[in-house]
Amino acid sequence: MTQFASPVLHSLLDTDAYKLHMQQAVFHHYYDVHVAAEFRCRGDDLLGIYADAIREQVQAMQHLRLQDDEYQWLSALPFFKADYLNWLREFRFNPEQVTVSNDNGKLDIRLSGPWREVILWEVPLLAVISEMVHRYRSPQADVAQALDTLESKLVDFSALTAGLDMSRFHLMDFGTRRRFSREVQETIVKRLQQESWFVGTSNYDLARRLSLTPMGTQAHEWFQAHQQISPDLANSQRAALAAWLEEYPDQLGIALTDCITMDAFLRDFGVEFASRYQGLRHDSGDPVEWGEKAIAHYEKLEIDPQSKTLVFSDNLDLRKAVELYRHFSSRVQLSFGIGTRLTCDIPQVKPLNIVIKLVECNGKPVAKLSDSPGKTICHDKAFVRALRKAFDLPHIKKAS
């Protein structure tokens, strides 16, 4: 499988914004921390046959570097510091940190190395996997089909929102990691730019080239790594929240809630954190139940929910976003991040449900115990038990 050997990626910034935000925080706070991460396909797809093609793309990624115009653009943003950007200018992907193999038909990928470097692999590598697989599986699919599908959905969206005050509806593109292709994502984002409710993209390359607002704060790995960085497991989530505020005291203040379930998060999210963070992001579990819990928590702390933002980003499409908007729009500020249902929405194309998640920090296990049992990831069952005990979690959920 070498007929598509041309590089999929053309820019170091073709990644999610929160990767650079987290990388800067790691650079400043945890320079010597080492991590390991693993690829998971949550579906039944046997992707091992694409291992050689993916490995070839991994090798090509070492040639990506921050260009001068990209450096200047990042320098103009308010939250990046000069020491980090100067280091990023010299950064190169190291393919030796990545092993790719075909394990009896399953695609096996493991990453390991300094966290400050490994952190940048996840999103572009997932985008590479998605695009390579779709090139082979769906050679007939093209950008025009993706755009036609979007236009049809926008017609439905207009009908669905007729007569509804949409002034508080804000949509973001979160579609880099599972996109059909780089070209499809750019075409979809350009079309969405024509809509008044479209406010930005998580992709830094697209944000720069299309003059969009880059969107994103932190991911699960920030909280997972603190499970081993923090000397006290029960305090690890608070330590992660506090360290983020050290790096970004009054910016990038949307906190992800489901690394160790929403209930455990809210127990740690006291009045100081709730006041300083601008809002919360939903990524697993029932979104209405989650939103009601968030609003009730703010009210209990005597914080006006109208001053905070809830970001919904779990398996959304336009219809689901409108349903959530109808339910919550009068009580709290809202944003919606849609990924796969925008950038890999083509007839007869099956999107991949793929992730890369942290499994170790400094040689010790870390875990994600989200509000959706199927999203739990950890090899070490004893550590999962310890984590559940530390955070007083009920109901044992199977770790995968």
Curated annotation (Swiss-Prot):
Cross-referenced InterPro entries: N/Namide_PRibTrfase (IPR041525), NAPRTase_N (IPR040727), Nic_PRibTrfase (IPR006406), Nic_PRibTrfase-Fam (IPR007229), Nicotinate_pribotase-like_C (IPR036068)
Ligase listed as a keyword: yes
GO cellular component terms, semicolon-separated: cytosol
Post-translational modification as stated in the protein's UniProt record: Transiently phosphorylated on a His residue during the reaction cycle. Phosphorylation strongly increases the affinity for substrates and increases the rate of nicotinate D-ribonucleotide production. Dephosphorylation regenerates the low-affinity form of the enzyme, leading to product release.
Reaction catalyzed: nicotinate + 5-phospho-alpha-D-ribose 1-diphosphate + ATP + H2O = nicotinate beta-D-ribonucleotide + ADP + phosphate + diphosphate
Top EC class, one word: ligase
Molecular function terms from GO: nicotinate phosphoribosyltransferase activity
Phosphohistidine: residues bearing it: H220
Annotated family: Belongs to the NAPRTase family.
Function recorded in the entry: Catalyzes the synthesis of beta-nicotinate D-ribonucleotide from nicotinate and 5-phospho-D-ribose 1-phosphate at the expense of ATP.
Protein's name according to its UniProt entry: Nicotinate phosphoribosyltransferase
Organism: Escherichia coli O157:H7
